[in-house]
Design a protein with these regions (language model features):
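Iron-associated oxidoreductase/ferritin-like identity signal
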Residues: 1-97
């Protein structure tokens, strides 16, 4: 699986690649946590527990957003793609050049 670790010898990887890997793995974990909390919220019958789970899920979304921003600042191509696709009302598939 993609989250299990490096696919190349770590000694062959630059510090920048290792840091980006760390950020990407962290982002994957945050998004996985959002998914798990969504499922827990749907299944939860106790109103007060459901409120806590919703709060926790939304915190994970904040963490994911912070990681996306870090990646954007470090990767100019990713930044360009985010600029093209985010915060627009154009159909998602109409962005191709």
């Amino acid at each position: 699986m993609a989250h299990e670790g490096y696919h190349e010898p770590i000694e062959d990887l630059s510090a920048e690649t290792r840091e980006m890997h760390r950020a990407i793995i962290s982002l994957m974990e945050e998004l996985e946590a959002v998914d798990w909390y969504n499922q827990r919220v749907d299944a939860c019958k106790d109103t007060s527990l459901k409120e806590i789970l919703i709060h926790n899920r939304d915190e994970e979304k904040e963490h994911a957003a912070m990681l996306i921003e870090w990646i954007r600042r470090k990767d100019s191509i990713f930044a360009k793609e985010l600029k093209d696709y985010l915060f627009t009302d154009k159909p998602i598939t109409d962005h191709h050049e």
